[in-house]
Structures are given as structure tokens and as C-alpha cells.
């Protein structure tokens, strides 16, 4: 007997590719299974057959028919730092380098596999209840920090509604290149996707709004508190680049892929014959706080993810060798 599902793309997932969207909404099924369903025409977008790479828009309707016996994705243990949990909502501190959903096949560990394992086997509130994680927003693989997950359809609808209504407040910590002069500002630049999968500012694009405040200045760098008001793909990264201050590490939109001590400390050189290890080699972006209403009518709460170890180490080094900018 086949299993049918229908989803409406929320604003928080606008711009996501069809295959990634299905993996987000149907995490129990393997990537290869979902690819096969798309190729066989068992998936439609707005009643039309679609390709795996189709970028979805807010309000698109995705319908899926899954045949009996379709291969499911297996849960697997992943070290998880649980920041908040009740019977309906889970917030975890996603480590950098861990993809939320499978990106290249099904070999690497993923957050979704770890969440499945946690809910089924470890959660004191949910194990044995048959619940599965329902993603309501995303973090890039190389971004660390707090991620909200719904446990049931009601919580998924409630959280998604808060994202769509811009009720949820998100706060990131970002290290960017150069000295940012304005203490605080709002970046209001519509974004559109290029043919190569990158995002760029464009008057033809969709509304994208980001606020920032300066936390600390260093010689050649600035530490920002960043509050995105919309949830476009790569929004923070593209907006910061647009004002001339890209993330200090961003291989896609910035100037480097790693930061080494030798680039910060003038007299430092690695020992002869040794290869220097970078202080940090991922996006200098951390999802620090999220404020939301876990259940209707109970009031807002804030969940905070401690600064990731590599980001914290980098900031300490900057304070020591790059002083105040």
C-alpha cells in the first residue's frame, strides 16, 4: 500500500532544492529512494513533474507518493548537545562540519540520522513513542549553533508559522573582514539565485533583511551580532559581502578558506618540516540564540548555544595579537 504526503513550502525553507526539501520532510527515507521517486514521477510540484534540483518557492505544493517497501534511512548515533527539550520541541547545538541531511550519498553521519537515533533510543521524553524529527529551518554544514526541531505535526505547524510570520528571532555571531564603521545598521537587499547555485543581490530578487550590531573590533576584522529578519538561502553571507565585509572564512563568497596563526602573529613561523594547522577552517558564523514560542499561548523563550570551540579560540587569538581595531 502506497503512502501519500503533501507539503507546502514555508518561507523558512524558500529556495531549497526539491531533493533537499524531501530529505528534510521525509528523513526516514534514504536519499537514493527520494531520488528514485522524483525520477519515476512520484513527486510533483504544483501538480507538475519536477527535477531533483528544482529550487522551490514559498507556497509551492509538493506531493509525494511512496510505494510500500521503499528503502528507509537508518538512524545512527551522533554526539548531540541538547539545549532544550519538551514533549513537542527539541533544540540542539549543531557542531560545525555535520550536515543536517545527507549531501553526497548516505555514508557520512548527519544530524538528521543522529536526531532519529536520539528520539528513538535516548530522549527521556520521546523514546519508544515513534516520533521523528521535523526540520523547520536550516543551518549550513559549516555553521555551528542552535537548531530547532519539531517532534510532531502540531509543533511543526506552530514553529513554521512563527518563521513565516517573522515571530521567531535569530541571532548569529559573525567574524568579518575589515573594519565595519557603522555601529549598527539594517541591510535591505533582495536576493536571487544565480545559475550556478549562488545567491546575489538583485532588484528582481526576493525580500531579504538583515540587521547587525558591532560587538568588537580587531585590527583587520570585526565581530558582529547579526539578526536576520528573513530566511533566504545564504542571506547573511551574501549581505555581509554586499557591504564590503564578507565572513572572514567563506570559500563561496569570501576571500579565504582558513585562518592560520602565522597570518595573525607577525613573528610566528611553524617549525621546520611541520605543516601549520589552521586555527579555524570553516565559516566564521555561529547561530548563537533563537527566541520562539514552544507552544501556543505559553509565551516566548530563548535558547542559547555556547560559542563553538574553534570560534572562541579564534576570538581569543585576535584579542591577543590583533588588539582593538
Indicate where each model-derived feature is located:
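Well-ordered beta-strand positions
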Residues: 83-84, 192, 213-216, 227, ...
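Short histidine-centered loop motifs in beta-beta connectors
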Residues: 47-49, 213, 219-220, 224-227
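Pseudouridine synthases involved in rRNA/tRNA modification
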Residues: 1-36, 206, 216-219, 229, ...
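Short beta-strand segments enriched for Tyr within beta-sheet-rich domains
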Residues: 159, 232-240
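Short, surface-exposed secondary-structure edge patches
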Residues: 51-55, 225, 282
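Short coil-to-beta-strand transition motifs
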Residues: 74-77, 202-210, 284-285
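RNA pseudouridine synthases
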Residues: 1-196, 209, 307-320
Amino acid at each position: 500500500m502506497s503512502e501519500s504526503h503533501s507539503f507546502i513550502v514555508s518561507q523558512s525553507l524558500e529556495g531549497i532544492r526539491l531533493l533537499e526539501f524531501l530529505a528534510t520532510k521525509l528523513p526516514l527515507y534514504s536519499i537514493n529512494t527520494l531520488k528514485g521517486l522524483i525520477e519515476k514521477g512520484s513527486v510533483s510540484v504544483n501538480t507538475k513533474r519536477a527535477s531533483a534540483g528544482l529550487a522551490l518557492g514559498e507556497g509551492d505544493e509538493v506531493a509525494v507518493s511512496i510505494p510500500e517497501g521503499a528503502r528507509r534511512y537508518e538512524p545512527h548515533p551522533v554526539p548531540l548537545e541538547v539545549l532544550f527539550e519538551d514533549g513537542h520541541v527539541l533544540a540542539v547545538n549543531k557542531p560545525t562540519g555535520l550536515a543536517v541531511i545527507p549531501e553526497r550519498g548516505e555514508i557520512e553521519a548527519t544530524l538528521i540520522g543522529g536526531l532519529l537515533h536520539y528520539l528513538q533510543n535516548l530522549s527521556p521524553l520521546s523514546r519508544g513513542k515513534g516520533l521523528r524529527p521535523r526540520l523547520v529551518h536550516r543551518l549550513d554544514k559549516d555553521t555551528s549553533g542552535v537548531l530547532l526541531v519539531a517532534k510532531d505535526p502540531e509543533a511543526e505547524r506552530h514553529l513554521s508559522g512563527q518563521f513565516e510570520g517573522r515571530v521567531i528571532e535569530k541571532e548569529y555571531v559573525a567574524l568579518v573582514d575589515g573594519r565595519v564603521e557603522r555601529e549598527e545598521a539594517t541591510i535591505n537587499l533582495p536576493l536571487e539565485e544565480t545559475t550556478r547555485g549562488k545567491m546575489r543581490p538583485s532588484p528582481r530578487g526576493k525580500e531579504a533583511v538583515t540587521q547587525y550590531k558591532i560587538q568588537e573590533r580587531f585590527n583587520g576584522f570585526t565581530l558582529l551580532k547579526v539578526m536576520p529578519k528573513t530566511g533566504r538561502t545564504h542571506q547573511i553571507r551574501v549581505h555581509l559581502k554586499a557591504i564590503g565585509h564578507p565572513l572572514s572564512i567563506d570559500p563561496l563568497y569570501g576571500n579565504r578558506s582558513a585562518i592560520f596563526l602565522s597570518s595573525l602573529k607577525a613573528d610566528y613561523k611553524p617549525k621546520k618540516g611541520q605543516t601549520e594547522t589552521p586555527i579555524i577552517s570553516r565559516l566564521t558564523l555561529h547561530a548563537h540564540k533563537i527566541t520562539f514560542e514552544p507552544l501556543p499561548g505559553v509565551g516566548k523563550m530563548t535558547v542559547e548555544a555556547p560559542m563553538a570551540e574553534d570560534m572562541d579560540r579564534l576570538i581569543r587569538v585576535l584579542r591577543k595579537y590583533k588588539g582593538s581595531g
